[in-house]
């Protein structure tokens, strides 16, 4: 009887497949992506590598030592304090506690602050509160801290916003009116996003994470790209990550262009150059999970798309790896076995520069991803490598080499807790445990500025207050 291996369906249900069936599923998933995106299939060796990862006997797997990458985040602390019947675990805690828990307990390389409603439009009335929260977090934290939110252009349509719902207009065959409504909404999205981030950057934010870009289609992406363009012009030092909502940009409008490229119908490898052109530092591509397909099919399909996006992108790629995307099952408590295998495959086969940790409970998302492929933040040198990706648009290899040279260590040492513990204390760039008298918060980041030869916005903000 042929040996069967434990895998998952796209909804998280456990299944058992033979090696031959796994390879067949991998081939089919890769072929699907190749056909849709008009891109190459995975090679035979890459398919075998994926099969090996999926058939590994351990519950949790991880990347080979030395291949670790920085992680970024979607939804911020909501996975801890949120309790809306999805992936939040409802722990009563402040956002400062949530951010510091990710930094000190989870070993995150970066973190983000976000509003409970997690869209830019609802932040407007409470932006002063968000600015105060950002200031307090920046005073206490060392890793890069973003402000994260969704463009969420749907909030600008009735009944929540001022413009007529294009869906209703299209049902009445008022196509031109629907397009006009989308264009107005995109203008407001750009304006609101820029206004909010002007306030947050003045309060010390390292940057912004646009989460689920193009959720409302091509006009949503158009408004976001223009916001990125404006922010980059105003704030050359701002860290900007643009993460997508889905694998393909839906053509709700159908005629909008950016840089003379029609946005409707773009796949990840076609999205990347435009996002870089607008001024983003990091691109977060997405590939959707099909809940009725196997994890072998879904992961192969996702890796095929992302590998091509990494190849086409002029900037680092942090693939979105929350529940329901990136080959990960659509389940609020993503299975550790599926998450760690997908994480490893994206690094070792697709060649991503980082992982954008998405929606899911704390164990299933940040803990699993960081154990599988993260650089463990200030336990080692993950925060330093992340800063070079964002401040200088360095790909993972270049960023590691740069930081290793500054520290006078080998790139393998950058994720070595023993090496980095002593070095961080010696250089006074912040350590994960409480050491009396050691530099913390702003002081540690000022030392990081000198070490890496970069500017850090929270330090600039602090210096301006002293003047």
UniProtKB/Swiss-Prot annotation:
Cytoplasm as UniProt keyword: no
Domain of life, source organism: Archaea
Keywords, sorted A to Z: Methanogenesis, Methyltransferase, Pyrrolysine, Transferase
Record-linked InterPro entries: Dimeth_MeTrfase_MtbB (IPR012653)
Pathway, per record: One-carbon metabolism; methanogenesis from dimethylamine
GO biological process: methanogenesis; methylation
Substrates-to-products reaction catalysed: Co(I)-[dimethylamine-specific corrinoid protein] + dimethylamine + H(+) = methyl-Co(III)-[dimethylamine-specific corrinoid protein] + methylamine
EC number: 2.1.1.249
MF-aspect GO terms: dimethylamine methyltransferase activity
Function: Catalyzes the transfer of a methyl group from dimethylamine to the corrinoid cofactor of MtbC.
Recorded family membership: Belongs to the dimethylamine methyltransferase family.
Protein's name in the database: Dimethylamine methyltransferase MtbB3
Classification lineage: Archaea, Methanobacteriati, Methanobacteriota, Stenosarchaea group, Methanomicrobia
């Amino acid at each position: 009887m042929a040996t069967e291996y434990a895998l998952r369906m796209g909804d998280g249900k456990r299944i058992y497949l033979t090696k031959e069936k796994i390879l067949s599923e991998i081939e089919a998933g890769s072929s699907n992506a190749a056909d849709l995106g008009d891109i190459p299939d995975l090679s035979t060796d890459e398919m075998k590598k994926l099969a090996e990862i999926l058939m590994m006997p351990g519950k949790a797997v991880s990347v080979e030592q030395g291949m670790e990458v920085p992680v970024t985040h979607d939804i911020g602390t909501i996975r801890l304090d949120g309790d809306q019947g999805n992936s939040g675990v409802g722990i009563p805690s402040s956002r400062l506690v949530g951010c510091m828990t990710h930094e000190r307990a989870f070993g995150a390389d970066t973190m983000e602050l976000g509003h409970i409603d997690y869209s830019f439009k609802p932040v407007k009335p409470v932006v002063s509160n968000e600015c105060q929260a950002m200031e307090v977090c920046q005073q206490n934290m060392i890793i890069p801290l973003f402000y994260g939110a969704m463009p969420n252009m749907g909030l600008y349509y009735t009944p929540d916003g001022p413009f007529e719902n294009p869906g209703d207009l299209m049902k009445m065959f008022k196509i031109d009116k629907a397009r006009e409504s989308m264009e107005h909404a995109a203008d407001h999205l750009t304006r609101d996003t820029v206004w909010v981030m002007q306030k947050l950057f003045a309060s010390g934010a390292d940057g912004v994470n646009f989460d689920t870009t193009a959720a409302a289609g091509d006009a949503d992406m158009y408004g976001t790209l223009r916001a990125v363009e404006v922010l980059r012009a105003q704030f050359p030092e701002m860290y900007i990550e643009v993460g997508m909502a889905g694998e393909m940009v839906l053509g709700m409008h159908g005629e909008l262009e950016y840089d003379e490229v029609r946005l409707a119908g773009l796949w990840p490898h076609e999205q990347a150059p435009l996002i870089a052109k607008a001024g983003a530092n990091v691109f977060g591509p997405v590939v959707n999970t099909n809940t009725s397909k196997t994890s072998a099919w879904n992961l192969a399909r996702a890796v095929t798309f992302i590998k091509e996006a990494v190849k086409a992108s002029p900037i680092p790629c942090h693939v979105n790896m929350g529940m329901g995307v990136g080959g990960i099952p659509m389940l609020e408590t993503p299975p550790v076995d599926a998450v760690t295998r997908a994480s490893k495959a994206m690094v070792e086969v697709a060649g991503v520069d980082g992982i954008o940790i998405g929606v899911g409970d704390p164990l299933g998302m940040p803990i699993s991803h960081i154990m599988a492929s993260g650089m463990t933040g200030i336990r080692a040198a993950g925060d330093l490598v992340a800063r070079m990706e964002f401040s200088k648009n360095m790909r993972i290899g270049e960023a590691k080499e740069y930081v290793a040279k500054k520290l006078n260590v080998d790139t393998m040492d950058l994720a070595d807790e023993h090496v980095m513990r002593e070095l961080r204390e010696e250089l006074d760039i912040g350590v994960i445990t409480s050491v009396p008298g050691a530099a913390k918060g702003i002081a540690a980041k000022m030392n990081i500025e000198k070490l890496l030869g970069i500017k850090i916005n929270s330090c600039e903000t602090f210096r301006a207050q002293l003047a």
